[in-house]
Every structure is written in C-alpha cells, then in structure tokens.
Amino acid sequence: MYRKWDLCITRHLLPYIEHSVIPIIALLVLSLIFYILYICFGTTSYILSGIILGAYVNSLFHNNHSVILNIKHPELGEPLKPYQTPLPPELEAPLQLLISKLTQHYINGWYKHVSEDPSFIREVQSTIEYIMRQFYAYVSSQESSHIIYELLKNAISTTTLVLSDLNHFRSKKIPLTEFALRYPESAVSKLLDQASIERTLRAQASAMIVKFSRPEDSACLPLHCLLREVLAMQVFKRITTHCSSPRFVNRCIILYFSSSEDKSDCLAKKNYVNKCLMAKALKDYPVHTNIDPDAGKLSFDDAFYEAHIELHYQFLKEASLNTLIKDKKMLKFIITVRPVHLHVSPWVVYRRYRGFKTLYYLLKKQSARNGRAVPSFPVWRGNTYEKFREGLYFFIEALLHDSHFATNVDVRKFFAKSMRSHPLVDDIYNGFDVDKKHQSSSVPTLPNLTNISRVLSNKTSKSAKPKRSERTGLLSHQSTLAPEPLSQQRDSFELCTTGYRDTGSCTSDDEDSIHEPYRPASTQPTENPPAMPDHNGSPTTEPPKPNAFELKEERLKEIISGGFALVDELCSLNSKLWFFRKSVLTIMKTTVLHGPGRFSAQVERMLKNQIYDKLSNTQLVGDLLTSLILNVWPDEKKAMESHSTRAHRRSTESKISFDSEADSLFEEASKSVPEDPVSVFCDEESDESLRLRAEKTLVENALSENFTLMLGQSTSEESLKIIFELLQEPQFVQGFLAHLLSNALRSII
C-alpha cells in the first residue's frame, strides 16, 4: 500500500567499500600516520587533520553547495493492483459492494474532513480487496471436507457447552445477567461480555490481516490497526448486531421452519435468499443496525473495580459498637456492593469473619508467587467493633481500588451476589462462608427479572422435585450445586470460542495477535497454501481447484458423537424423565456408531446435501452476501450524501456529483434484491405478532415426528420454549453469533 523511501547510500565518504578490503587497509594507514603526526607535532596534528577532512568534505558539494545524498522521493501514482484471483460473477458484485460501503461509508466519512486527496482512500480500498481475494483463494485451495468438518466440530462443541451452562443456569432460577455476574468464568458470561466479544473479533481480524495481506502492509502497525478495526467493528460486529435483533431472529425462524408452499417455490427457483430471507422480510429499522460508539460497554471484568462498599454488622446494636470484641463468632457482616463500571442494581452479600480471613489467606498465598503485596488485615483481639469495622473497610477499599485484586477470581467470588433472602445462607460454595446447616434448607428466591427466568421457573411442584432415580442421573451427568465445573471448563470454552490468550488488556492482546497469532495444530491446513503474489501483484501459481467432498470414518463418528452430546444437553433442559431419555440416547448412539448398518454413509450424504451443496453454490452465497450487506447498511446511500455534503459544505455547488464507479456497483448489487418480492414472509407484522408466530412455528416444526415421540410432546415443547426465550435476548444471540463467526474464521485460517 505504501512506498518505501529509496535512500541510496552515498559512496563518496568510503568509495567501493563493499568490493575490496583496500579501504580498511587505508584506514589503518591513516590511523598510523595520524599517530606519527601526533608524536612529532603534538596538538598541531588536530589542526592538520581538520584541514584534510574539510577539503575532503568540500569535494562532496556541487557548485550550488548542495550535499549529494541522492534521495529518491516516492511517486504517488496508481495503487498496486490486488491479486486478481478469478472470482465467479456471483461473488464479484458482493465483494465490490462491500468494499465500496466500507471505504465510502466508514473511511471517507472522516478522511474527507482533513484532506481532499483521495490517494489514501484508494490505497485502503486496494488493500481490503487484496485481503478478500487472498482469503477466497486460500479457501478455494483447501479441502472442502476438512473445512466443513472443522466448522461443524466447533459449532457443535460451542453450542453443547452453552447448553450445558444453561442447564446450570436453569437450576439456579435466576436472571441471565445476574447468573453471568455471579459466575464470570461461565460460557454465558463470555457470551454477554461485550468487551470479550470485541477482543475475540479483533483477534480474528488481526489473524486475517497477518495471513492474507501484503508483508509490508502487515508490518505497518498503524495500517494494521486501521484494517483490524474496519474488519472487526465495521464488518463482523455490525453483522452480528443486525442478525441478533429479535425481529431478524423471528423472521429466520418462520422462514426456515415454515412448511408453506411459498418456501418450496422459492427453493425450487433457487431464489431462496433473495425473495424470502432478505429484502423487506428481514430489513429492520435503522436503530437495530446503528452502533453508538459512546454507549457503555457491559464488561463483567470491571464489575467490582472501584465499587462502593457499605459494611455493617448484622445483629449488633449501635450502643455496642464501642465495646471490646469478646468472640469472633459475633463478627457477621452485611455488605452492600454498588458497581461503578457496570450498570446493574446494587446487591447485598452476607459474610462472616471466617470468610474474610479465608480471602486474606488466599490472596497472601498468591502474592508469594507474583510478588504483589496484600493490604493489611485488621486484628480483632483488643479492638472494639467500630475500630475493627473501620480496619475491615479499609482492607476492602484497598482490594477493590487495585485493578489486580479487583479482577481476581477469589475476590469476585467473595463479593458475588447472594440470591437468598435468608441471611448467611450463600449459594456460592467457594470455601469462604458455607453454612452447612442451611445448605439443604429451602428458602424463597428473589423475584425473577426476565422472561427467561419466568419460563425456567414456571414449573409445577412435581417437576420441581424429581424422583430419586432422576436426581441420581442428574448428579452423575453434571454438578448443579458447585460452580467448580464452570471454572474447569474455562480453558476449553476459551479455546473453543476465541483461540487466543485473554490478557485482559487490548494493547497486549493486539500485539500478540499482530505478531504471533494463535493457530491450533488441528486447524492447520493439510495442503500447502497457494503461492502468494509478489509486490507487483503478479501471482506465481494459480490456486488449485477444491477437492470433492469426502469425510473419513473417524471424522464422521466424531460428528455423530458431538450431535448426540448436543441432543443430550437439549434434553437436559427439562428434568422430566431425564434419566430414561439419556438411556435411550445412549442406546441409539451405540447403534449408530457400532451397529450392523452403516449409518455414517447416511450422515455423510446428509452433510453433502444440506451443507456442502449450499456452500458450493456461488449463486446462493452471493445472493446471501448481497442481501445481507444491503440490509446491514440500509441507509448507506444517504450516508454517502451526508458525508460528501459535510466535506464540501464550504463549496458553492448545490448538487453533489458522486463517483460513477460507486454508483454503478451499488446499482448492480441492488438488482439482486427485488423491490416488491412476492412472498408471504414479507407481510408487515408487529413485533408481538411476529414473536408469537415464530414461537408457534418453532415448537411445531423444529423437531421431527420421530424425535418428538422419543422425547415426548411436553418435553420437546418445554425445551424449545426455553431455547426460543433465549433467542429473544439480543446480547445473548450477538455473543453466540460472534463466537460462531470466530470459530469459523479460526477453522478456516
């Protein structure tokens, strides 16, 4: 993208030093002569040396007294042409449309205010096009079965882990955001954390830039950061934000699970995406797609940093505050936590002296390894209740005002919410303050705050207390009481969803992703990548054609096992007859994998028909990309006009002349979406009616008849209702789509 300064080395000072050793010998002789002159003439030798050196430097000047440095200034001509990988016509138009939108809508919007020179915009546009074409060339050269296998494996594992976490969330019967706050290492917390999502998308964008851009462009850190923000925030995040809106999700549910004749007609005409999926059917209001850069980010990492704390005794009167402490068992506290960097309501936790002391010992043990000093802990002996409370308050303040301790796992668990209304009964079994007498007691929970909790907690008394055999099966499958399994799954979930180290700092994370992108061994390509073009843009070899779709027996069995694990977690959303359904699924899995019939061939044929044929259909993929781009940026044409108007507000022209090339690309891509699509899915409906229609369609048509008979009608309906309520949460869906997109890019790259 940029030109290097051609600084030619002058050869006047040391002529021909690279061709022989004579200059070195001459330098030694001159040093010897200078030493002899110094012995003979003393300090006068410095004056003689200065005269000789001045005469030599004078020979470097022309008549106009300018030093010969031979600096060649760069020539800002046409940008380097990107690698012209032959793209199908169905994919060429979406690529040009996307590049035009990114450059004109994002870069041109702020660059026009500072400069009228379009060279920078052309260079950025050329670089983005180069990356996209290299990405397509790389994907085309890879084995299709390997890519589909990696995509399926990561999607199934991510979905299974999220469902397993939701089963733990269902057992707690608490709102989704509070569950994520109390269990920051869970998969749900990762999906709701906007800062974590942005780090994940930036990491994948950096990996794409490092692998598919020119070496000189990747080495330029300012350009790298600009391209990373364009890909991560303007492409990946805008798409996931648009697709996570409830209206979009409900339209997709109605479309994919509807059995109307219009859908069959669209499928037969291969206009499935154009006429049904996109256009007016999925065009949301602009508020769903606009991203407010000044909006606060929901980050659970900063939940306790600089939080306001109120510390009071639980059963102590004010008149007794000045008395001496006789027994530490009387030190029972009520702590009110008011977060500053997280927009949630304050909560109350109940802790004893034993819990504070345990936290202090844990932090002190960790400080022995990292060398970080822990704030001093007050002594209760010989102190009054008031003095001890002040010392304890200063201890808490010192912890929460230190970013290292405020983000510590033990500190976060200590100040996590207590969802029980009864004092000193904490359902966070972390070793701080566990009252074994009340562990089995039934205490009322606080009112639920979201529709998800209402659906999950809307159980009958019979379903709330499963039978002994069912409880045994539940305990053998997963622990629903202690949060330790969630912490043990942290590494596997981070590897499954991000694949990058979470350093907690955007700067260090960006540097790691720029210089050393993480690429697991399982995702390395099986073949050599296509030959990269030189700096002039001419390739050395053409990328080979994709291979035929064929999966090995081991990979098919792994996909089948993952599918049964996914169904197992889906069935676990309902506790009724869970042990019986688990036994049936185990028998079916054994029959499919080790039975006499070769079911793997049927699975392979299904994957080929449902996934491979659709991904290899360039017309279908091109229509999907075109329609999605036009709906993610619905008012892009108006944005171009406003940007140009602000840039030329001092001009006397009353009419803005647009770039003819951008207009032609926009008109060409707009032809893919008809203005008046004929489809029953394009009827204007209210959000509530659309929601009810989508819920009914999902419950009735999502599962096949055989699968419904195996699970039971009520069981399948209840599980699907829980899934539907989760799909109505935009933050949850956005995080899930972002991690799926990250998994797909990591599998391909």
From Swiss-Prot:
Ranges for domain PXA: 88-261
Gene3D superfamilies according to UniProt: Phox-like domain
Domain PX: start-end pairs: 311-422
Main location: endoplasmic reticulum
Record-linked InterPro entries: Phox_assoc, PX_dom, PX_dom_sf, Sorting_nexin_C
SMART domains given in the database record: PXA (SM00313)
Entry membrane topology: Single-pass type II membrane protein
Renumbered residue ranges of the record's region Disordered: 439-489, 504-546
Keywords annotated in UniProt: Endoplasmic reticulum, Meiosis, Membrane, Signal-anchor, Transmembrane, Transmembrane helix
Record's function text: Has a role in meiosis.
Family: Belongs to the sorting nexin family.
Name of the protein in its database record: Meiotically up-regulated gene 122 protein
Species: Schizosaccharomyces pombe (strain 972 / ATCC 24843)
